[in-house]
Amino acid sequence: MAPDIDNIWSSTTDAAESPVDERRILLKRAVGQKILVPSILSLMPAWPSQVHPAVDEVNTEIDKWLPTVNVAEKKKAKHRARGNYAFLTAVYYPYCKETERLVVIAKFLYWIFFWDDEIDTGGELTEDEEGTIQCCEETNKCVDDCLGPNPNYNPPPNSRGTVEMFYPILRDFRAGLGPVSTERLRLELHDYINGVAKQQKVRQGERLPDPWYHFKIRSDDVGVIPSITQNEYAMKFELPEYVRRHEAMEEIVQECTKLTVLLNDVLSLQKEFRDSQLENLVLLFMNRYNLSLQAAVDKVLDLIREHYAICVAAEKRLPWSEDDEKLNDDIREYVRGCQRLATGTAYWSYSCERYFKQTQVNDKWEVLLDLSYVE
């Protein structure tokens, strides 16, 4: 279980080595190692993975749309080659009612990766705190313009490309969501946008963060939570607010979010290490507890098992109706949507080359991660 984080910094701020030494020592301990990671999907056995049959059609529509987006061609090409977010959309929403809605969600996923890349390690705003604040303010304004009480779908003049492209995407979401879901999505997007800025401050800190603190802020503000609400858009239903705020549903959302963070940090470990992005839970556990790479990976895998079990148990406490089967169907679909955020992220990670090469994955879906530097 996670410890109390009230005093988490006490063990790191008194460390003898300098912040530079701390990072250098961690890099030296991990570099050159290889580790075989078991199938992440096997750790969530009751949650199957499917792919929407219209994935190729969505890809075709994305190919038509991308040239119209005001984002650097190099960035578009990189994400198109390595990401395949149309496929990610198809595993997140395998039963989406309309292909047109699936295309809108795919555009949203392209937006979130484009936008996050501006601020994440290696982006234009990675070291620019003032620029990041301005970017977040402009993006938050877009969210309120499109999803607030007085909708305005016209981006301000000279908007940055990632803000400009977001206006029509949110317009389409609003057209297909009920008022309760629209407001939920608005608030969740604000949490995500503000959370990215908060994570940037952590990365800019002199010392590596405590893993439990890092896990908490990422789980609180991670971008998958809006994608859960978008399942209501995909499946054409609106979950009543009392069901969404029921303690069991809150726990399922939180636990699936935590699962997504945990499994993503395992599967992205090789890429992030090679990018010298050390704010990864595996590496942070190595640093905090002086663990070997194997022990740190095992710790994260154990956390996946733990949070999966909590999530499965919570389903029994949901507010099932005795006489409204439509409501029960909507609850089941909402829960499946939460689960697919975890399984879909894993399935997609194995199926594209954003984090590692296909040649590193065997027929058991085990992946051999390689923490060597590659020019």
Swiss-Prot record:
EC number assigned by the record: 4.2.3.-
Reactions catalysed, semicolon-separated, are: (2E,6E)-farnesyl diphosphate + H2O = trichobrasilenol + diphosphate
- Name a GO molecular-function annotation: metal ion binding
Task: Give the pathway.
Answer: Secondary metabolite biosynthesis
Q: Where does Mg(2+) 3 bind?
A: N264, S268
For binding Mg(2+) 1, which residues are annotated in this chain's numbering? D116
At the top level of its lineage, which domain of life is listed? Eukaryota
Which amino acid positions bind Mg(2+) 2, per UniProt? D116
* Cofactor(s) this protein requires: Mg(2+)
Which residues participate in (2E,6E)-farnesyl diphosphate binding? R354, Y355
| Cofactor mode of binding and number, as noted | Binds 3 Mg(2+) ions per monomer.
Keywords on this record?
Lyase, Magnesium, Metal-binding
Q: What InterPro entries does the database record attribute to this sequence?
A: Isoprenoid_synthase_dom_sf, Terpene_cyclase-like_2
Q: Where is this motif: WxxxxxRY motif?
A: 348-355
Q: How does it assemble?
A: Homodimer.
Q: What is known of its domains?
A: The 2 conserved active-site motifs D(D/E)XX(D/E) and NSE are required for coordinating the divalent metal ions that stabilize the PPi moiety of the substrate.
PANTHER family per the UniProt record, alphabetical: BETA-PINACENE SYNTHASE-RELATED (PTHR35201:SF4), TERPENE SYNTHASE (PTHR35201)
Q: What does this protein do?
A: Terpene cyclase; part of the gene cluster that mediates the biosynthesis of the brasilane terpene glycosides brasilane D and E. The biosynthesis starts with the activity of the terpene cyclase braA that converts farnesyl pyrophosphate into the sesquiterpene alcohol trichobrasilenol. Subsequently, trichobrasilenol is glycosylated by the O-glycosyltransferase braB putatively using UDP-GlcNAc as sugar donor to yield brasilane A. The latter then undergoes two rounds of oxidation performed by the cytochrome P450 monooxygenase braC.
Task: Give the protein name, as stated in the record.
Answer: Terpene cyclase braA
> From which organism does this entry originate?
Annulohypoxylon truncatum (Hypoxylon truncatum)
